[in-house]
Amino acid sequence: MAASLQQEFCALRDTYIEKQFGRLNDMQRQAVFTTDGPLLILAGAGSGKTTVLVNRIANLIRFGSAHGSSWTPREVTEEDVKALKTAIMTGTDAPAWLDGMLRQNAVRSWNVMAITFANKAAGELKERLRNMLGGEEGDEVFASTFHSACVRILRRWAESIGYPRSFTIYDTDDSQRVMKAVYKELSIDDKFFPIKSAINQMSRWKDQLVSPEEALRTPARDTKGAIAAKVYAAYEKKLREAGAFDFDDLIYQTVQLLAEHEDVREFYQNKYRYLLVDEYQDTSVAQFRLVSLLTGPEKNICVVGDDDQSIYRFRGATIENILNFERIFPGTKTIRLEQNYRSTSNILNAANCVIQHNTERKGKTLWTRNDEGDKVQVYTAENEQDEAMHIADVIGEHLKEGGHLADHAVLYRMNAQSAPIESYFTRAGIPHKIVGGQRFNDRKEVKDIHSYMSIVANARDDVRLRRIINEPARKIGNTTVDVIADLAAQQGISMLEVISHADAYAKLSRAIMPLLKFWQIYEKLQESLETRTLDEFAQDVIEVTGYKAMLEADAAKGHEDAADRLQNLGQLVNNVKNYCDQHGEDASLEGYLEDIALISDIDSYNESADQVVLMTIHSAKGLEFPYVFLIGMEEGVFPSEMSKYSEADLEEERRLAYVGITRAKKELYISNSVSRMLYGRTQRNEPSRFLREIEPEYIEETRSPALERRSSMGWGSGYSDTVPGGASGYSGASGWGRNSSSFGGRTGGSYLNREYNASERGGFGSGYAGRGSSASGFGSGSSAPRASGSSGFGAGYGRPAAPKPASKLVSFPGSPAASRPASTGPKHYEVGDIVEHKVFGRGRVLAVKAAAGDQIVEINFEKVGVKKTMANFAPLTKITEE
């Protein structure tokens, strides 16, 4: 009887626990219920990996390893069985007295550490844990980024490795300032060995866990290598003297701490018995070592990642970490999450087609229960301006159908590709946001105030002191600053300490008054920090230093940016207040400075703003949008020119394409251009091999109207490697493809799906090769008979029957695309006119300025305030008041 009750209860317990995670699919539940030992979760794009992480942590804390177990802490009674049956049937929680019977080896929330790559991901994880576990228990789980976790460890143990607990975190600009000082001391010519190159080499060494001493001991391959090692040692010495870490140091120094101090290592292994790491495919050598050192003897480590999305090799990430995980951690259980909840099946099939060409991968195939959706739209543009117009057309159509600007993202391989899109959107009045532009905290006035705050937090921070000692101007010149630095170095003290006794140094006699005034400012700020709230302290820094007065004076003189800079400082104070509200009693100056040091580009992305988003594919990792435009899909652009010479680099480019494709939820638009200007040079590139890897059944191809017109007139749109002409059609070749000189290749084929063979192609073009026809561009050499309906040279695609019109899309009124077919003449506005904008709504014209045959119109919109736009390009309609 007892045994049967035991079995019945355990079966009911499994059912009860499974119902708590009823929204998960089978593979997700497997991942959640695998609690002990090393676990590798290969999570495909859009497969719900964050959901799995949150639910796995919740299961560890609420039930432990109870699911699938036949163990109970005491003998089962009929009352236990009855109570559990009732809870299952009614969908209610089991009674509290039964809690102990539902758990086995349950984990305390403070014994779990979850590491992510982005602050945004860490924030989402914390929020979802709070919602699932309750505020207090959810907050006790340590969910953090790699760098934030390291800062937390170093704040407690930095003194063990010779640094103060109040250390400063240097950003790229600070590192460059330190390096300039090192170059000056070592008499190194920046033209021979650029500072940027030295910093990059140092970063690689730290990622590889190479110390300055090891770098000096290792024989250099050339003079620059020897210089880099000397610079590395001198740079680290300066950072140690300043009590500062750069961004790479946060992980590098934490690894050194854990490796060299067994007591510290054991403390964290005992504290965090369960370790979960997200985005494991993007970990570096140093991050792998950190994870290994934090993993305790029980090896309760769970890593989540997708080898097909490993795209950060240029930052030191190594895909081998995830590919070799099972070998490094014997006994690993591997679970694949292949069901996608994000995209349509056509988008996923396109992604699968591309990524299957990689060899360095674990292997998985995404699938979905979502609708088939529209085919992937592939557009061939005449040039980058045409590409931008096409994107505006599509967005305009979506807006007419009730869509939102924020539903759209334009993704590109490199930042340089954004300029034509941004320029066109600006002229067309399409609100947009570039992610990865200048960050708020990188603005000069903001960095200056943060530097003042930093020297109050860390008096040894000579780099930040140098930045602001004469900002605003105080008659403290570079010569005086150099003397202060020399005196500090001679005595082994900080520059601030020298300034505090400036009157004791004869060498500083000419600058006594300015230096003493600066010291008085510093003392006032110290007092403010001790006696006032953190946001009040920030306001004091802005005012006591004279910074606010300087900007107010600039504004009075008519300096255009002074008012904006003052607003930025007001926002800085708001940011400090928000930080205090979020952290409560734990708020501190050091904590605030940590937060701003660890902010990434993507953290500034505001999803609630109704704007089209422009960003690199690297920045888009982890995001999703209903409509995605993947531009510049051409050989030499994507994949990049350099990647062609390395199979590993080419596979990384293909993974990047896979990431770009899988950002799309509803519709994906891919474009390539016959000609493109990049870095001041016009390039004529073949369509990307990644396009050709997508099976024809998943794509729909369209072309620029200009290419269609040239096709109908008998002009080719291609070019050859040796014959100039290209877009104008004066080419000696009509296309490319295996055993064919045309795009179309075989009869009825699509040029995108020919196997690329550079040695066999006769030239680049876009010859039409419809059903029953051949591509007959200049010099094609095709002998197949041509059917009626295609007499043009080039500019075609291998479609059945006649070429398809370029677009069925309706552009929004007033957009440049809408006026492309026929000019309607210039628009003219006057002050006082009432206008209607497609996006901004109704407004009144405040000012009009002539500009290159157009007008710059300043309009006060009722909904969004004052905006400037170009009259001939903005979607504006003049309204007659009744």
Positions of PLM-derived features:
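C-terminal accessory regions
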Residues: 633-865, 873-882
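ATP-hydrolysis module of ASCE/P-loop NTPase motor domains
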Residues: 35, 40, 117, 137-141, ...
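Short basic/glycine-enriched coil/helix segment immediately N-terminal to the Walker B
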Residues: 33, 37, 104-109, 256-275, ...
